[in-house]
Amino acid sequence: MYLKIPCNSIYHQFQPLFRARTVHKVRSLGLNGFYRKYHGFNSLRFVRVLQEAGIDDKKSETLMRLISNVYSDMHEKISDFSVTKEQQDRVMYQQKVDFAHLRSELQSIERQEMVALHSQVEQLFSDVERLKTSFRDQLNNSTSEARLQLNIDRLNHYDETASQDLKLRELSAEIDTEMSNFRTQLASFKTQTLQWVFGIVTGSGALLLAYVRLII
C-alpha cells in the first residue's frame, strides 16, 4: 500500500531541513571527502513537519524510521572508508622508516661490493706481478743456461761457431716471440680487467642513481 503525500507542500516545508542537512554535510567533509563529524538525524522535527503536512502519527513515524535507518546506514558505510590524520601520519612514518632501512641496506651492500671489488683487483694485480716475476726468472735462467752452453760449445767446437750462432738466433727469436706473446696476453688481461672493473662500477652507479630517484 502506497502513501499519498502532497509532494509540493511537503517539499516546501522540508526545504529548510534538507538545506540545513546539506550545509552540515559540506562543512563536515574532510580531506578525503568523508565526514569528520556525524550530525544526528532530527527525527522529532521530521515527524512534526510530517504531521503539519497532514500525515497521521503512524505514517509519520514509519517514514521517520525509514529515513533515519537509511541515513544511519549511509553514515556507517562512509565512516568505514574514512582515514584519520593519525593513520595517515602512521603510514607516512612507516614509509620513511622503510626508505631509511632500504637506503641503509643499499649503502651496506655498496660498501661490501666495493671492498670485495678492491680486494679482487688487488689480488689480480698481485697475481700478474707474481706471474711476471716468475716468467722473468725462468727467462733469465733459460737465457743464462743457453749462453753458458753456447760458450762451452764455442770453446770445444770452434768450427761449429756458425751453427751455434744460428741456434742462438733461433733461441733469441723464440724468446722474442714468447715475450711478444706474453705482452699481448698481458695487455689483453689488463683490458679485460679494466672492462670488468668499469662494468661493476657502472652497475653500482646505476643502482645508486636508481635509489636516489626512488628516494626523490
Curated annotation (Swiss-Prot):
A Pfam family recorded for this sequence: CCDC90-like
Family, similarity comment: Belongs to the CCDC90 family.
Keyword line: Coiled coil, Membrane, Mitochondrion, Transit peptide, Transmembrane, Transmembrane helix
Protein location: Mitochondrion; Membrane
Family matches, as InterPro entries: CCDC90-like (IPR024461)
Organism per entry: Schizosaccharomyces pombe (strain 972 / ATCC 24843)
Bilayer disposition of the protein: Single-pass membrane protein
Gene Ontology CC: mitochondrial inner membrane; mitochondrion
Biological processes per GO annotation: calcium import into the mitochondrion; mitochondrial cytochrome c oxidase assembly
Main location: mitochondrion
Coiled coil: 111-133
Protein name: Protein fmp32, mitochondrial
Membrane-crossing segments per the record: 193-215
Gene name linked to the record: fmp32
Keyword Coiled coil (UniProt): yes
